[in-house]
């Protein structure tokens, strides 16, 4: 913020700058531009008092100047008159320039009003377009409900089919368990069959071996019989030969016959004993082999019966397994067909849902785009309103400055023609009045500009409140609560800012000695900067509100 200061010896003002902190007020009021206009109208009284003080100071200064002219020569008077003429010509040129600028400002205001009307018409059209998608939303919601019901029915059917599938899977698992048990029993039977076959083979081998041993024993028995017969024949031949020799030598050896009889008896006993032992061994061996053969025959018969029974059971289980397998294949085929049908229905429903979601997304994007355009138009409208207010303030400032200059010129002309009485007495009063006006005016103007900025920001916040009222009905209550809190906080901040401004004005009245002045162009730039800052803040707030709206819609 800058303050203005005037030099009474120069009708044209000098520009001096004195920096002071800027004010940022976030208060929200619904006064609009009426508060700004009332503030502008309320400035007329202090400005008039300042103009009176300025005219008095100017008249005093002109009186002191004429008092000094009496003591000057004619050449100096001519130089002073030429300076005054040049100053008047400069003032006329400046006045003409200001009039031209005022006309340009008025034309610009008219153009901005026309643009504002056009933008308001476009805003109405966009609001109408924004109100239209509610019908589509109802239709889409109805279709979504129907599709959700269809999806729920499909889900229930899927659950029923899954239950049936689970029951079939339980049956299949039971059949598979039975099949595995039968396979295990078959493997056990086959193992037992192999063992029986192995035992039968071993029994056959043992029987063949025994038969071979019987044959060998029979051959040995026949050989022994033959040997025995040969021995008997030899013994008989020897006995006959001995008998003949005994008969021939009877006279010589009478005891040989008795010895031969003893020997014959001994050999007969030995042969009979050997024969009896061989027959007993053969009979015992034959009985043992017969018993083992009978036992092996019974075991082979039992094994054959068990193998035939196992084959019969295996054939029956194989037929049952084939039937179960066929039933399982049929059920799996039916289940696969049901799954394919269900997946096709689900994919069709999902495609329909995706299509509706895409349409809903496009509709939401269009709504967001319309809202963004609406926000842009509102921002442009607010910027234009701020610019118009800034131009209006500039024009009023120029009017006040022109009134100051016109009053000063009139009073200076009047004092040049009037007689001068008591100028030495009024010289101190003139200097003190000038210092009072020049020191108090910058402080007054700085407080005035601060109040204007506060009013501008209040109008911006009022526009924000209007936009918040035009927002969707779902967020109305929350936004009203937030706006109420912001209004309370903004009211407190505004009161604090006003108290700070009053304190600054009092401090400026008491101890401020620096004089400064800021041009209308810089005021316009500051107003534009504040407008841009507020526009950016509004955009951020609207983006946050849009995000909250989308989240609320998603939750709904």
Swiss-Prot record:
Organism encoding this protein: Coturnix japonica
Residue ranges, annotated region (Coil 2B): 283-398
Keyword set includes Cell membrane: no
Modified residues (N-acetylserine): 2
Cell compartment(s), UniProt: Cell projection, Axon; Cytoplasm, Cytoskeleton
Region (Tail, subdomain A): 399-445
GO molecular function: identical protein binding; structural constituent of cytoskeleton; structural constituent of postsynaptic intermediate filament cytoskeleton
Residues covered by region (Coil 1A): 95-126
Function field: Neurofilaments usually contain three intermediate filament proteins: NEFL, NEFM, and NEFH which are involved in the maintenance of neuronal caliber. May additionally cooperate with the neuronal intermediate filament proteins to form neuronal filamentous networks.
Spans annotated as Disordered: 464-556
UniProt protein name: Neurofilament light polypeptide
Region annotation Linker 2: where it falls in the sequence: 274-282
Pfam families: Filament, Filament_head
Span list, region Linker 1: 127-139
